[in-house]
UniProtKB/Swiss-Prot annotation:
Belongs to the HrcA family. Signal peptide: none annotated. The gene is hrcA. GO terms for biological process: negative regulation of DNA-templated transcription. This is Heat-inducible transcription repressor HrcA. Negative regulator of class I heat shock genes (grpE-dnaK-dnaJ and groELS operons). Prevents heat-shock induction of these operons. It comes from the Bacteria. PANTHER family: HEAT-INDUCIBLE TRANSCRIPTION REPRESSOR HRCA. Keywords: Repressor, Stress response, Transcription, Transcription regulation. Pfam families: HrcA. GO terms for molecular function: DNA binding.
């Protein structure tokens, strides 16, 4: 259990290191308004904090820097969300006031806002395609027995699939098929298309098209292969180059390689998490993230979580400010998407 004096010294060390990226010595601490103890007392308390594992010494300086354990204690017990400036709030609100009719553009906008305001890297995990509904399907003949199905969702996502029919279909048959699919499947969730097709489309195919069973098989294969993965949106991919910790070429290379690997990035998100979570250094379970912290928030519609929005920064990131920014951006993103889905 830390004493009040140790808590104060730890908090001041971390706040100063977040601001300056320079190790903090007892002389620096003695000049702080909040610190009224003697230099000898400060040195003794710092020695105790180091022995307890909350701060550590660097090789190149006599000062101390926070350890991962120190950051975790700070986040869990000492952190207060930072009040955002009126300019920051206006920037966030104005970005979502712009009329955007596609989910993906709205989500990308939120990633860009966060990276601009934090100067860190932001990642938004978009909703799974199964959360989208089919808005329209277009069929474009490319060969006598082939057509490209262009599926457009209510989020603005576009997916192209090649349909191979066992028999030749003329243009009028393609048009009939397209009209039937749009009349019965528009508004249906993407992961329910195949089931709905066998329940509602099959009778119309039988009535209006010959060889309907072959057409049904071809459509079934197409809808089965529809992607169900979440899409990743990034903001400020190279922002970490501006952070002193990442002037080390090997360190920044590892992080850049991680960001380019979708499977690795997906490991940073947990499907059942709610609210705002903070993972520090090794807690991310990825070697490239050992010098980084990840703060994640969820966004939702009608209390149903759709995806996650995250900020990657150095372990000395400004936690209080980033937590506040994530809170506001995730809330405004949720409101913007609710309005989009209601239209």
């Amino acid at each position: 259990m830390l004493t009040n004096r140790q808590l104060l010294i730890l908090q001041v060390i971390i706040n100063d290191f977040i601001r300056s990226a320079q190790p903090v010595g007892s002389r620096t601490l003695s000049k702080k308004e909040d610190i009224t103890f003697s230099s000898a007392t400060i040195r003794n308390e710092m020695a105790d904090l180091e022995e307890l594992g909350f701060i550590e010494k660097t090789h190149s300086s006599s000062g101390r820097i926070p350890s991962e354990k120190g950051y975790r204690y700070y986040v869990d017990h000492l952190l207060s969300p930072r009040k955002l400036s009126s300019n920051e709030l206006v920037l966030i609100q104005s970005a979502f006031q712009e009329k955007i009719f596609e989910l993906e553009k709205t989500v990308q906008k939120s990633a860009e806002i966060l990276s601009d305001l934090t100067n860190y890297t932001s990642i938004v995990l978009g909703p799974k395609l199964s959360e989208n509904r089919l808005k329209q399907i277009q069929l474009v003949p490319v060969q006598p027995n082939k057509a490209v199905a262009i599926m457009i969702t209510d989020s603005g996502h576009v997916e192209n699939k090649t349909i191979t029919f066992s028999e030749h279909l003329d243009v009028s048959d393609i048009e009939k098929l397209m009209n039937i699919l749009n009349s019965r499947l528009a508004g249906v969730p993407m992961d329910q298309l195949k089931d709905r097709m066998y329940k509602e489309v099959v009778m119309l195919l039988r009535t209006h098209l010959k060889d309907y069973d072959h057409i049904l098989d071809a459509l079934g294969n197409t809808f089965t292969s529809t992607q169900n993965e979440s899409k990743l949106f990034f903001g400020g991919k190279i922002n970490m180059l501006n952070q002193p910790e990442f002037h080390d070429i090997d360190r920044i290379r590892s992080l850049m390689m991680l960001i380019e690997q979708k499977n690795d990035v997906m490991q940073l998100f947990h499907p059942n998490q709610q609210g705002i979570t903070i993972k520090i250094g090794s807690e991310n379970n990825l070697e490239a993230m050992e010098n980084c912290s990840l703060i994640t928030a969820t966004y939702s519609i009608d209390q149903k979580s759709l995806g996650s929005i995250a900020v990657i920064g150095p372990t000395r990131m400004d936690y209080g400010r980033v937590v506040s920014l994530l809170h506001h951006v995730s809330k405004d993103l949720s409101n913007a998407l609710s309005n989009l889905y209601d239209e």
